[in-house]
Amino acid sequence: MPTEEELLASYPSKCAAGSLAGTPGNLTSEHEAALEELRKVLKQAGFTKRLDDSTLLRFLRARKFDVAAARAMFENCEKWRKENGVDTIFEDFHYEEKPLVAKFYPQYYHKTDKDGRPVYIEELGAVNLTEMYKITTQERMLKNLIWEYESFSRYRLPASSRQADCLVETSCTILDLKGISISAAAQVLSYVREASNIGQNYYPERMGKFYMINAPFGFSAAFRLFKPFLDPVTVSKIFILGSSYQKELLKQIPAENLPVKFGGQSDVSEAEGGLYLSDIGPWRNPKYIGPEGEAPKAFSMSPKPESA
C-alpha cells in the first residue's frame, strides 16, 4: 500500500469551484485559520494520521468550524477506529455471504453522478430480515458497512476524483422505498439506527445528494414538518420523491450511468456480477486507478457463507 502522502498526492486536492463553503478550494480566511488551529492541536496531542485538509475540514464542517468540538469529534473517531481495528479491516474482515445477503437487502455502488460522485443505491423496500439473518448477523452487516466506508474513502473517491479532475468527497445516494411496509421498516430500524450513528460520528460530511424514491404517501408531508429542525445545508441535499422520480434522478445522474430499473440506460450482465455485485465505476477502470490499486471485494463470486 502507498503511504498516506503518496495517495493524497495522486489525485486532485481541491473541490470544484463553487462547491460547498468550507470544502478544499472554497475556504474563507476564517476557515483556513480554523483548519490550521485544528491541525496544530491534533499534532500536539500526538496524532499523525488523517491530518490532511479534506479530512480535517469534514470534521470542522460537521461542527460548524468550532475547533474544540471538531477536535473532540476527531479524537472520538480515532479511538473508535482503534477499538474496531478499522485500519486493518481489509486484511481482517471477509464478507463471503454478501452475494446471498444482497438478495434480501440490496446495497451497492454503481458508476457516478454528473458531479463525479459515486452513486450508492440501497433498496430498503426489498429487505427481508427473516431470511437475511439466517445467513448473517447485524454485527457482521455493520462490520461490512465500515468496510464499505473505508473502501469508499481509500479507493472509490480517489478514482472518482481523477475521473472528475477535481476532489470528490461525497456520494449520491438513492434509497428505494418501493414496497416498504411498516413491519419491514420496524425490523430494519435497529440496523439503520446503528448505521446512521457510524456515518454521522465517524465518517462525517460524506453525503452529497440523497434521493428517497417510491416514498409512501404522506412521507413528503412528514418530512416538511421536520425540515425546520434540520440543518439547512442538510435539507438542501435531500429529495423525497414518489413513484415519478425518473426525471429528477436524470437531472443528477447521466442516463448511461443510471440502472435501467430506475429509468436509466445502464445494464449489467449476470456474468459481471449483476447490478448488486458488479460494483462498476472509475475504481474499476485502469485509467483512473492510482497507487492504491483496484478497489478490493470482501467476497468471492462463488461464496460459502461464513459463520459469525
Curated annotation (Swiss-Prot):
Gene Ontology molecular function: phosphatidylcholine transporter activity; phosphatidylinositol transfer activity
Location of this chain's protein in the cell: Golgi apparatus membrane
GO-annotated cellular components: cytosol; Golgi membrane
Protein's UniProt keywords contain Signal: no
GO terms classed as biological process: ascospore formation; Golgi to plasma membrane protein transport; Golgi to vacuole transport; Golgi vesicle budding; negative regulation of phosphatidylcholine biosynthetic process; negative regulation of phosphatidylglycerol biosynthetic process; phosphatidylinositol metabolic process; post-Golgi vesicle-mediated transport
Membrane topology: Peripheral membrane protein
CDD domains: SEC14
Keyword vocabulary terms for this entry: Golgi apparatus, Membrane, Protein transport, Transport
Domain CRAL-TRIO: 97-270
UniProt cross-references to InterPro entries, sorted A to Z: CRAL-TRIO_dom (IPR001251), CRAL-TRIO_dom_sf (IPR036865), CRAL/TRIO_N_dom (IPR011074), CRAL/TRIO_N_dom_sf (IPR036273), PI/PC_transfer (IPR051026)
Pfam families: CRAL_TRIO, CRAL_TRIO_N
Keyword Zinc-finger part of the UniProt annotation: no
Top-level taxon of origin: Eukaryota
Matches recorded under PANTHER family: CRAL-TRIO DOMAIN-CONTAINING PROTEIN YKL091C-RELATED
Function: Required for transport of secretory proteins from the Golgi complex. Catalyzes the transfer of phosphatidylinositol and phosphatidylcholine between membranes in vitro.
Name assigned to this protein: SEC14 cytosolic factor
Organism of provenance: Eremothecium gossypii (strain ATCC 10895 / CBS 109.51 / FGSC 9923 / NRRL Y-1056) (Yeast)
Species lineage: Eukaryota, Fungi, Dikarya, Ascomycota, Saccharomycotina
Name of encoding gene: SEC14
